[in-house]
């Protein structure tokens, strides 16, 4: 595993904006995985923070980086049903996967995946010894893939609702939180279309 002192849990890149002489935005440039707009935790609605934690890592504020109960639950399910799809990754592990183990999408064997997961678990514990939960959650919310090329909650709020993250209502916060489970499948642009004339009455 990488040395914990050498790892960086900060997001890897951000979008760049070009403006004309009058200050109007004329172009947005973003490399793959870099369409993110950083925000601080206090700018993110508490409802969204709570919803993401409830969906992604319900024991986030209780564990030390790894969720032993979640690991045991996923292990029992795998042994009894043969279904290895249930994950037990914590928010801290997911943050490491996205910002440190960036080649995880090219893993081709169970051994590669298992090796990476063990390293993630080790580093998650080390990171939580030196980093507070709020910093971890803030970086996670600025990093998470929310579909349609949006990484982080501010980019997603702009993409889906044409709003800043702090202006989202409860329903919009719930929608963003729900995307985390399957960013392509739950893309609101694909799920919600204009009502038909019949629907409009």
What residue ranges belong to the model's regions?
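Flexible, acidic/glycine-enriched loop-and-adjacent beta/alpha segments
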Residues: 40-91, 151-155, 161, 168
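Acidic/histidine-rich, surface-exposed loop or edge segments in extracytoplasmic proteins
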Residues: 28-36, 53, 182-184
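Non-catalytic, structured segments within soluble enzyme domains
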Residues: 88-194, 198
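Extracytoplasmic
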Residues: 11-14, 21, 34-36, 47-49, ...
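N-terminal type II signal-anchor transmembrane helix
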Residues: 1-21, 59
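N-terminal post-signal-peptidase region of extra-cytosolic proteins
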Residues: 3-4, 33-41
């Amino acid at each position: 595993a990488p040395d914990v002192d050498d790892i960086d849990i900060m997001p890897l890149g951000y979008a760049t904006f070009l403006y004309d002489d009058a200050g109007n935005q004329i172009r947005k440039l973003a490399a793959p995985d870099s369409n993110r707009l950083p925000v601080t935790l206090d700018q993110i609605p508490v409802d969204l923070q709570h919803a993401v934690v409830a969906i992604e890592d319900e024991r986030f504020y209780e564990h030390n980086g790894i969720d032993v109960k979640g690991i045991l639950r996923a292990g029992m399910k795998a042994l009894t049903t043969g279904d290895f799809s249930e994950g037990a990754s914590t928010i801290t592990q997911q943050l490491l996967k996205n910002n440190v183990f960036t080649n995880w999408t090219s893993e081709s064997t169970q051994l590669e995946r298992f090796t990476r997961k063990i390293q993630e678990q080790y580093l998650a514990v080390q990171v939580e010894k030196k980093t507070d939960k709020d910093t971890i959650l803030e970086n996670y919310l600025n990093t998470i893939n929310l579909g349609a090329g949006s990484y982080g909650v501010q980019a997603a709020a702009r993409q889906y609702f044409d709003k800043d993250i702090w202006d989202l209502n409860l329903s919009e916060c719930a929608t963003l939180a729900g995307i985390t489970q399957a960013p392509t499948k739950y893309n609101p642009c694909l799920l919600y279309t204009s009502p038909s004339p019949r629907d409009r009455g």
